[in-house]
Amino acid sequence: MSNSLQSVILKTAEEKSGSRCISGCMYQVVPTIGSDGKKLLQLLPISKSSGNLIPVVQSPVMSHGLKANTEKPVQVTFQTQISSSSTSASVQLPVFQPANTTKCFFTGAIDTTGKDRVTSVRTGNFTPPVSNIQNHGVKIHKLTRQTFTIPPSTQNDSSHFIFNTPSLLPNVNSSILPSGNHLKIPAHAEVKSVLASSLPPLVQQKILGTATTSTSGTVEASQIPTVVYVHPVNSVKFVVTKKTQTIYPKPVTFNTLQIPPNVATETQLKGGQHPQAAPVNSIFQEYLQPGIPCIIPVKSSNNVATKVLNTFVGRKNLGDNTIDTPLLNTNSSGRTHSVSEPIKDNALIMFNGKVWLNEKGTCGLPSKIDQQNSVSSDIPLKDSSQLVSSSIVTEISREILNSVLVKSKSFQLKTKSLSNSQLASMANLRAEKNEKVERPSFSVTNPHTMNQSTHCLKQSKTVFINPVFPDGFRTGQNAPRKGNLVQNIEKICSSVDAATVTSQQCVFRDQESQTQYEMASIVKKEIQEKGNNKKYSQGSHTNIKASCLKNDAEFKKLFGLTKDLRVCLTRIPDHLSSGKSFNSFNSLMKSSSYKDANIVVKKEEKKQSFSKKRKAETMKMGNTKKIKIENADDTVMSIMNGTDVASSQPLSSILPTSDISQHNIVTSHSTTREDKRTEAEHCSHEKQEKGTLSSSTSFEQSTFLNKNFMEDIFPVTPPELEETIRDEKIRRLKQILREKEAALEELRKKMYQKQ
């Protein structure tokens, strides 16, 4: 038998006398053309006699197999076993079929005393009117064997049964649709009706084609269509849950419609009553292209999203057309990224009877700013092979738009139940969007400053790491003037809101707004503190006065202070702020430094043990060189008091090298004498300070009574340069003295060892 023919073989063991049945016949399926010009499959019963096939009867019943795949023959074998008993007859119907998607309908006329037994390959809840059903199944070399078992019937009837082979999942090259998975729209999915012009140019070119472009290639405003945008979508496993229904097929010609399979399709068994004279019919429905992807409507809590897909796949008046879901493949390397923001979830774009699956990372709906700078990428798109007629597309579009409107109304009802704070935040974000003012964002575009400043904006938190603010606003040493602080903070908050709207595609999140407000307030406080510290050292008195008043008002707003707080500050008189007033402070510093040096010298002397001979020699040398050491001590004091600036040279130049040991020997005497001097000076300075303070008490009171507290300024003045230089000289001289003392100690040890 040639490959272009499909055969239905009926094998029997014995035939009961006096009764006409279907045994001993082999049916040959021959493709023909009907009167209406359609392709049909005709069943020709053939009698088997001495090994030759002889056609005996031509059955008038035909099946429409327009979509049948004649390259893969299907063999259906009936094995009928009839015994002498009138109640023990049974029929087994093993069916072998290829693994592609096939739907078969069988109607059989059973003998008056016959019994049927049917077994299904799929386990399900079957409820025929006769009794329960047993089921089992096996798989052989990618072929499915199905056996149906029906309990015996006591009446003269004919059993009618239809079974649908399990729909195998088409092969789809997609990262979100692996083998065994289908698309699912979750409950929180959003269904939007957007203009086609809002899509990226690449998607417009591949999905819309020439629908939005005129002959010159420009987009006409009056012909811009709308598309349905559904996101997010997920993938689910293939689940079999649908129950069976009882139907009565008629022996007529059936049209083979290429309708996408339902996710709940399974092996079904239907039983019922039908006249006995019904002949045997075999109707095959096959898919011409089993590898075409299909949309699967899955039961979901979101009725609107489910109805959208049911609109595309649940209509029976689509004719011979089907709906494809071409994929936006994202596996191409070396593509240029579009300026439009990549979507975080999978999405569906529906237009003109086609459903496009937009995978993760591909270009989604761009924002208004991104549309102006969108760049076409090299993402390959697969065009669909078939389109739905214009009238059907119009009906589908109307139904989808109605469902979207219902969704938007329900969203408005939900917003009424929100709290006042949430509504306020949403209103602020909408106002920022309606202004259409492009504000600079925090993101750094300069490659030289990329490592210095970074801005991270995520779903639920905002991280600032040395941010670069708009209009050259920078933290640290380049802090702006205090007068522009409030305006800059407002720009920061608005730019943060604008960036959030762009990144989240106008999805309002309360957590983000709260986090951004907290971060903005923290940055504001830090900038104010840094600006205040810098202006105290650089600003003039008038600027300091204005900044202090402004800072007070801002801090009152920040901390919620409502009462007037007055801080009274008094000025120090001019005679106290002169250079003489610092003598007491300098004397205190000198005395403390000398005491520290004295303690160090005494500790070193206690640790060392000298012999009696050594002590006697030191006393003699101290008497002979007493005058020279006093002169050296006077020079050191002049350096400490700042009277002789040119005497900042090292101590080795002041003291000759020959006198180093002698100077070291009488160091204790000179330090004790200097200690007495500093203590006397300290007492005199304290007395003088008390006198000046008591004399200036009346002056300060009169100043406080005569002048207003608003005119007072901070009395803190920066240290003078001369004092800083003097302190540095003192520190260096102390270090040099310690080094020289250490060198003298080594000389003493050497001299002691030699003696």
Curated annotation (Swiss-Prot):
The modification Phosphothreonine is found at residue 717. GO terms for molecular function: nuclear retinoic acid receptor binding. Keywords: Chromosome, Coiled coil, Isopeptide bond, Nucleus, Phosphoprotein, Transcription, Transcription regulation, Ubl conjugation. There is a cross-link at residues 270, 436, 590, 687 (Glycyl lysine isopeptide (Lys-Gly) (interchain with G-Cter in SUMO2)). Belongs to the LRIF1 family. The Pro-Xaa-Val-Xaa-Leu (PxVxL) motif mediates interaction with HP1 (CBX1/HP1-beta, CBX3/HP1-gamma and CBX5/HP1-alpha). This is Ligand-dependent nuclear receptor-interacting factor 1. It comes from Mus musculus. The lineage of its organism: Eukaryota, Metazoa, Chordata, Craniata, Vertebrata.
